[in-house]
């Protein structure tokens, strides 16, 4: 048994990934599969690591003054909307209207 994968880069050049999942001797075939999946994961990590590092460096160079915490919203806007939360734990905080 083997795992196959193919990555097509930005230039359109395909790169094939192949890992054998044979268990040594009469070993458990699922152990062989688990080992193959771990090997494939390592191969994919090695393949994408330079691409990810290049993307991170590109983003840092493009926006050196911005905080790269992943929060795209304005923090001041978040502070202004603290009291606008919905209470799902109980009844509405509004008083019911009394008949007049």
Curated annotation (Swiss-Prot):
What InterPro entries does the annotation carry? GON7_meta (IPR027893)
Q: Pfam families attached here?
A: DUF4611
Q: Does the keyword Oxidoreductase apply?
A: no
From start to end residue, where is composition biased (Acidic residues)? 64-81
Q: Which domain of life is it from?
A: Eukaryota
**GO biological process annotation, one example:** tRNA threonylcarbamoyladenosine modification
Q: Which GO terms describe its cellular component?
A: cytosol; EKC/KEOPS complex; nucleolus; nucleoplasm; nucleus
Keyword entries, A-Z: Acetylation, Disease variant, Epilepsy, Intellectual disability, Nucleus
- Quick one: where is this thing mainly located? nucleus
Protein's cellular compartments:
Nucleus
Q: Which residues carry this modification: N-acetylmethionine?
A: 1
**Presence of keyword Acetylation:** yes
Q: Where is this region: Disordered?
A: 61-100
Clinical disorder: Galloway-Mowat syndrome 9: A form of Galloway-Mowat syndrome, a severe renal-neurological disease characterized by early-onset nephrotic syndrome associated with microcephaly, central nervous system abnormalities, developmental delays, and a propensity for seizures. Brain anomalies include gyration defects ranging from lissencephaly to pachygyria and polymicrogyria, and cerebellar hypoplasia. Most patients show facial dysmorphism characterized by a small, narrow forehead, large/floppy ears, deep-set eyes, and micrognathia. Additional variable features are visual impairment and arachnodactyly.
Q: Which PANTHER family match?
A: EKC/KEOPS COMPLEX SUBUNIT GON7, EKC_KEOPS COMPLEX SUBUNIT GON7
Subunit text: Component of the EKC/KEOPS complex composed of at least GON7, TP53RK, TPRKB, OSGEP and LAGE3; the whole complex dimerizes.
Job description of the protein: Component of the EKC/KEOPS complex that is required for the formation of a threonylcarbamoyl group on adenosine at position 37 (t(6)A37) in tRNAs that read codons beginning with adenine. The complex is probably involved in the transfer of the threonylcarbamoyl moiety of threonylcarbamoyl-AMP (TC-AMP) to the N6 group of A37. GON7 plays a supporting role to the catalytic subunit OSGEP in the complex.
Q: What's this protein's name?
A: EKC/KEOPS complex subunit GON7
- The gene for this chain is GON7
